[in-house]
């Protein structure tokens, strides 16, 4: 992404360099980086943020000669307990969906009176144990930011 500061002080961002700008009609997007800088176009730095953070309003960094988004901490309206409960609910849904993939095996074996393969039973037990471990970890978080930043597993 690239941006420029307009005469009125506002910063305009572009996903790609415009083809025309000012007195350059066509080919503006082919100018070199240093040529673009003469027109006030500089790179935009977008930092990687955590769930507990958000990007602030884009600003010019004189020090680095780039436009950047400052990182700000999010304010959470839920209580710590509510955030934990919500995160745990999502966790259980994720693990429930993974366990559900083998439910048909359990049901089939029960209906037919077969013994379920130990690999299936072990895998299901491991999922339940892992879910309980992660639930304990979530409950151990002491700040809203730590709960928000706790990454849930993905089985995709």
Where do the protein language model's features map onto the residues?
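A preference for well-ordered globular domain cores
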Residues: 1-156
């Amino acid at each position: 992404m690239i941006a420029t500061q307009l005469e009125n002080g506002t910063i305009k961002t572009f996903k790609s360099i415009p083809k025309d700008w000012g007195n350059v009609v066509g080919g503006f997007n082919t100018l070199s980086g240093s040529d673009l800088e003469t027109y006030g176009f500089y790179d935009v730095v977008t930092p990687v943020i955590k769930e507990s953070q958000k990007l602030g309003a884009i600003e010019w960094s004189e020090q680095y000669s780039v436009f950047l988004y400052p990182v700000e901490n999010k304010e959470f309206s839920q209580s710590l307990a509510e955030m934990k409960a919500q995160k745990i609910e999502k966790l259980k849904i994720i693990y429930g969906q993974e366990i559900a993939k083998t439910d048909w095996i359990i049901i089939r074996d029960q209906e037919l009176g077969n013994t379920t393969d130990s690999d299936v039973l072990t895998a299901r037990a491991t999922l339940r144990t892992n879910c309980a471990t992660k639930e304990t970890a979530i409950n151990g978080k002491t700040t809203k930011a730590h709960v928000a930043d706790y990454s849930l597993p993905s089985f995709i």
